Protein backbone atom coordinates (compact mmCIF):
# COMPACT_ATOMS: atom_id res chain seq x y z
CA UNK A 1 0.00 0.00 0.00
CA UNK A 2 1.48 3.34 -0.98
CA UNK A 3 -0.18 6.54 0.11
CA UNK A 4 0.40 10.10 -1.03
CA UNK A 5 0.84 11.43 2.48
CA UNK A 6 4.11 12.94 3.59
CA UNK A 7 5.52 11.04 6.49
CA UNK A 8 4.31 12.34 9.83
CA UNK A 9 4.29 11.15 13.40
CA UNK A 10 0.99 10.50 15.13
CA UNK A 11 0.57 10.22 18.90
CA UNK A 12 -1.94 7.54 19.91
CA UNK A 13 -3.47 7.09 23.34
CA UNK A 14 -2.55 3.69 24.82
CA UNK A 15 -5.83 2.95 26.70
CA UNK A 16 -7.78 3.80 23.54
CA UNK A 17 -5.70 1.47 21.37
CA UNK A 18 -6.01 -1.37 23.85
CA UNK A 19 -9.81 -1.11 23.60
CA UNK A 20 -9.84 -1.43 19.80
CA UNK A 21 -9.72 -4.37 17.43
CA UNK A 22 -6.96 -4.58 14.81
CA UNK A 23 -9.33 -3.33 12.11
CA UNK A 24 -10.49 -0.42 14.28
CA UNK A 25 -6.89 0.48 15.20
CA UNK A 26 -5.99 0.60 11.51
CA UNK A 27 -8.97 2.85 10.72
CA UNK A 28 -8.21 5.06 13.74
CA UNK A 29 -4.58 5.51 12.70
CA UNK A 30 -5.54 6.29 9.09
CA UNK A 31 -8.15 8.80 10.25
CA UNK A 32 -5.56 10.59 12.39
CA UNK A 33 -3.08 10.61 9.51
CA UNK A 34 -5.76 12.16 7.27
CA UNK A 35 -6.60 14.80 9.90
CA UNK A 36 -2.91 15.58 10.44
CA UNK A 37 -2.42 16.09 6.72
CA UNK A 38 -5.62 18.07 6.16
CA UNK A 39 -7.75 19.46 9.01
CA UNK A 40 -10.67 19.71 6.56
CA UNK A 41 -10.52 16.01 5.70
CA UNK A 42 -13.73 14.06 5.34
CA UNK A 43 -14.76 10.45 5.70
CA UNK A 44 -13.97 10.00 2.00
CA UNK A 45 -10.30 10.79 2.70
CA UNK A 46 -10.20 7.99 5.26
CA UNK A 47 -11.96 5.66 2.80
CA UNK A 48 -9.30 6.47 0.20
CA UNK A 49 -6.45 5.76 2.63
CA UNK A 50 -7.88 2.60 4.19
CA UNK A 51 -9.74 0.95 1.34
CA UNK A 52 -12.47 0.19 3.87
CA UNK A 53 -16.14 0.90 3.12
CA UNK A 54 -17.65 4.22 4.16
CA UNK A 55 -20.23 2.41 6.33
CA UNK A 56 -17.54 0.55 8.26
CA UNK A 57 -15.53 3.73 8.79
CA UNK A 58 -18.66 5.60 9.89
CA UNK A 59 -19.33 2.90 12.50
CA UNK A 60 -15.71 3.05 13.65
CA UNK A 61 -15.83 6.85 13.89
CA UNK A 62 -18.84 6.65 16.20
CA UNK A 63 -16.82 4.40 18.51
CA UNK A 64 -13.75 6.65 18.30
CA UNK A 65 -15.85 9.64 19.29
CA UNK A 66 -16.91 7.77 22.43
CA UNK A 67 -13.54 6.34 23.53
CA UNK A 68 -10.85 8.42 21.83
CA UNK A 69 -9.65 11.99 21.55
CA UNK A 70 -11.52 12.42 18.27
CA UNK A 71 -14.16 15.14 17.96
CA UNK A 72 -16.71 15.24 15.15
CA UNK A 73 -18.35 18.60 14.40
CA UNK A 74 -21.62 17.97 12.59
CA UNK A 75 -22.79 21.59 12.30
CA UNK A 76 -21.76 22.35 8.70
CA UNK A 77 -22.45 20.83 5.30
CA UNK A 78 -19.98 18.05 6.01
CA UNK A 79 -18.51 16.68 9.20
CA UNK A 80 -15.26 18.19 10.46
CA UNK A 81 -12.88 16.01 12.44
CA UNK A 82 -10.37 17.17 15.03
CA UNK A 83 -8.00 15.28 17.26
CA UNK A 84 -6.48 16.25 20.58
CA UNK A 85 -3.06 14.69 20.97
CA UNK A 86 -2.58 12.89 24.26
CA UNK A 87 -0.03 14.31 26.70
CA UNK A 88 0.54 11.10 28.66
CA UNK A 89 0.12 7.35 28.11
CA UNK A 90 0.76 7.46 24.38
CA UNK A 91 2.84 5.83 21.68
CA UNK A 92 4.12 7.58 18.58
CA UNK A 93 3.97 5.88 15.20
CA UNK A 94 5.12 7.27 11.87
CA UNK A 95 2.67 7.31 8.98
CA UNK A 96 5.24 5.48 6.82
CA UNK A 97 3.86 2.31 8.42
CA UNK A 98 1.08 2.62 5.83
CA UNK A 99 3.67 2.12 3.07
CA UNK A 100 4.46 -1.42 4.19
CA UNK A 101 3.27 -4.28 2.03
CA UNK A 102 1.14 -6.09 4.62
CA UNK A 103 -2.55 -6.57 5.28
CA UNK A 104 -4.37 -3.80 7.17
CA UNK A 105 -5.10 -6.21 10.03
CA UNK A 106 -1.35 -6.71 10.49
CA UNK A 107 -0.87 -2.94 10.55
CA UNK A 108 -3.69 -2.66 13.09
CA UNK A 109 -2.04 -5.36 15.19
CA UNK A 110 1.33 -3.55 15.10
CA UNK A 111 -0.32 -0.30 16.16
CA UNK A 112 -1.94 -2.05 19.12
CA UNK A 113 1.20 -4.14 19.82
CA UNK A 114 3.27 -0.96 20.26
CA UNK A 115 1.24 -0.28 23.45
CA UNK A 116 2.91 -3.22 25.17
CA UNK A 117 6.48 -2.05 24.54
CA UNK A 118 8.76 -1.20 27.45
CA UNK A 119 8.90 2.49 28.29
CA UNK A 120 11.43 4.25 26.05
CA UNK A 121 12.27 1.08 24.13
CA UNK A 122 11.21 -0.96 21.13
CA UNK A 123 10.99 -4.23 23.02
CA UNK A 124 7.81 -6.08 23.98
CA UNK A 125 8.32 -8.62 26.77
CA UNK A 126 5.72 -11.10 25.59
CA UNK A 127 6.06 -14.57 24.12
CA UNK A 128 4.00 -15.53 21.10
CA UNK A 129 1.40 -17.35 23.20
CA UNK A 130 1.05 -14.41 25.60
CA UNK A 131 0.58 -12.07 22.64
CA UNK A 132 -2.19 -14.27 21.29
CA UNK A 133 -3.83 -14.50 24.72
CA UNK A 134 -3.37 -10.93 26.04
CA UNK A 135 -3.70 -8.91 22.85
CA UNK A 136 -6.23 -11.21 21.24
CA UNK A 137 -4.68 -11.83 17.83
CA UNK A 138 -4.12 -14.95 15.81
CA UNK A 139 -0.72 -16.59 15.42
CA UNK A 140 -0.71 -15.97 11.65
CA UNK A 141 -1.03 -12.20 12.20
CA UNK A 142 2.13 -12.20 14.31
CA UNK A 143 3.91 -14.46 11.79
CA UNK A 144 2.94 -12.07 8.97
CA UNK A 145 4.59 -9.18 10.84
CA UNK A 146 7.70 -11.31 11.40
CA UNK A 147 7.90 -12.41 7.74
CA UNK A 148 7.49 -8.81 6.55
CA UNK A 149 10.49 -7.77 8.67
CA UNK A 150 8.50 -5.34 10.82
CA UNK A 151 9.31 -7.06 14.11
CA UNK A 152 12.00 -9.49 15.19
CA UNK A 153 11.73 -12.32 17.70
CA UNK A 154 14.52 -12.87 20.23
CA UNK A 155 16.64 -16.00 19.92
CA UNK A 156 15.14 -17.47 23.07
CA UNK A 157 11.66 -16.42 21.88
CA UNK A 158 10.95 -14.50 25.08
CA UNK A 159 10.41 -11.06 23.58
CA UNK A 160 9.85 -9.18 20.34
CA UNK A 161 11.60 -6.08 19.02
CA UNK A 162 10.22 -3.52 16.57
CA UNK A 163 12.61 -3.06 13.65
CA UNK A 164 10.58 -1.05 11.12
CA UNK A 165 11.53 2.66 11.43
CA UNK A 166 7.89 3.78 11.71
CA UNK A 167 7.56 1.78 14.92
CA UNK A 168 10.96 2.65 16.43
CA UNK A 169 10.10 6.19 17.50
CA UNK A 170 10.69 6.64 21.21
At which residue positions do the language-model features occur?
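Short amphipathic alpha-helical interaction segments
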Residues: 52-66, 136-148
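The alpha-helix within a helix-turn-helix
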Residues: 47, 132
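Short recognition helix of helix-turn-helix/winged-helix DNA-binding domains
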Residues: 1-45, 56, 75-125
